[in-house]
Amino acid sequence: MDDYRRIADRIAADITGGRLRPGQRLPPQRAFARRHGIAPSTAGRVYAELVRRGLVVGEVGRGTFVRATAPDGQPGIALTEAAGAPLVNLELNYPAVPGQSELLAPALAPLLRPDALGEALRPAAAAGTPAARAAVSALLARGGLPAAPERIVFTGNARQAIAATLAALVRPGGRVGVEPLTYPLVKEIAARLGLALVPLATDAEGPVPQAVADAHRSAPLSALYLQPALHNPTSLTTSAGRLRQLADCVHRLGIPVVEDRIWAFLDPGGTPPLAALAPGLVHLVDSLSKRVAPGLTVGFAVVPRDRVKAVARAVRSGGWSAGAFALEAAVRWLGDGTVDRLVAAKRQDARRRQRLVAGKLAGFTVRSDPAAYFAWWELPAPWRADTFTAAARAHGIAVTPGTAFCVGPGRTPDAVRLGLGSAPEPQLARALQTLAGVARDGAAAGTG
C-alpha cells in the first residue's frame, strides 16, 4: 500500500474512533508534513484521500475540517456523537406536545379487549377499512379537499405514499420535476426506483410554471413532486394565484403531480390544495405522523379514480400497507377529537418555537414561516454548510446541511435547516443561542 494511504488510514481511524471530533480542524498541510516526516506533496495526497473517503471537507483559505457525518451516513440521521455524548437534535422533526400521551391513551384502551384486538391485528389492504376511509375523507374535507372515500389509498407513512404514487406514475428512467430544494428522502426514493429528478426554478410565489413547460419541452416529464404548503426546508407556501397557474400548466401538458401536504395542517389559513384545482392529475399525499406521533402512524394518498388500482398495486408490491392496528387507532383519534386537539396544540407550539428563532437568530438571514416547525438559515460569510454543520456538532448540536436538500448540479447553498420540533423548548433555546455564537465567532474570524 502507498505510504500516503497508510497515513490516511491512521487519520481515518482517529476520526471514526472519536479521537478527532466533527468540526475539528486538521493542521495545515505543511505542519502535518513536518509532524509526520513526509513531503508536503505527500501530505496533500493524504488530505485528498480523506476528502475522497468523505471523512473531511476542505475550504480554500479556511482549512480542512472533520465532517459532521460518517461517509456512508445520510445528513440528518445520526443522533449521537461518536464518543457517545447525546446531541441536541435539530435534524429530525418529530413534534410532541406536553400531555400528548395522556390524550392518546384513552382511545387505545378499548383495543386491548380480545375481540377488538383480534380485528385490529388482521392484515390491512391498501384500501384500508370503510371506517378509516370515512374518517380520512372527513379530515381532508375540513382541509379544503372533498375526496370520495374510494379515492383514498392507505400506507404505513407518507414516505411510502410518495414511493407508491411515484412507482405507479413513472417507469424506471423517467423524469420527475421537483423544486431545486426538496425533501431528502425523495432523492432516495427516486434513486431506488431508477427515476431522474429534474430541478425546476422557483420564485417567491412558488414553482414557476414556465420552468415546468421548459423542462417538459426539453424531455418529457413523467410527473412532478411538489410541496406547495410549508415547503421543507424553506417554509414557502405557494400563493393561490401561482397554484391556479400550475393547475392550468399541468392540465395543458398532461403531467400528473404528487402533492406533499404533510405539514399543511400547521397553517389552516394557507392556500387550498393543488389537488382541489386539478383532481384528475394531482395525487395528494399526507400522514398522521406529524399531527399525532411518528411511532404509530398512517399515511394516505388521494388518487384520481383511474389511478387507484395502480397505486394500490404499488403499495402491495412494495410492502407499504398500513397496519390494521394503526388504522383502527387513527379512526378513534380522528373520531373523538384527539387529532384536532393535538393539531391545535402543535400550531401554538410551532409559533412559540418560531419566536425563539426570531429572537435568538436576530440579525441573521433566516427564511421561515410563523407556522412552520423548521427554519432555513442562510449562513453568514465565510461559513459553508458542511463546515458549519461540523462546528455545530462539535458543540453538541445536530443540524442538516443544505446539501441534503439539493437536486442537480451547481453550487450548493451555504445554508442549514433547523428542525424545531424534536428538542424540548428550553433545550432548543440554548441550542439556538449557541449556534448564533458559533456563526458570529466564525464570521468574525473569517474561518468558516
Go through each PLM region and give its residues:
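Hydrophobic residues in well-ordered beta-strands that form the structural core
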Residues: 178, 199, 257-259, 330, ...
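Short loop segments at secondary-structure junctions
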Residues: 69-70, 279-280, 288, 303-307, ...
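Short beta-strand "wing" residues that participate in macromolecule-binding interfaces
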Residues: 57-58, 147, 399
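PLP-dependent aminotransferase class I/II
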Residues: 284-360, 365-369
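N-terminal basic, amphipathic alpha-helical segments
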Residues: 1-112, 121, 316-322, 344-349, ...
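Conserved core of the PLP fold type I
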Residues: 119-253, 264-283, 441-447
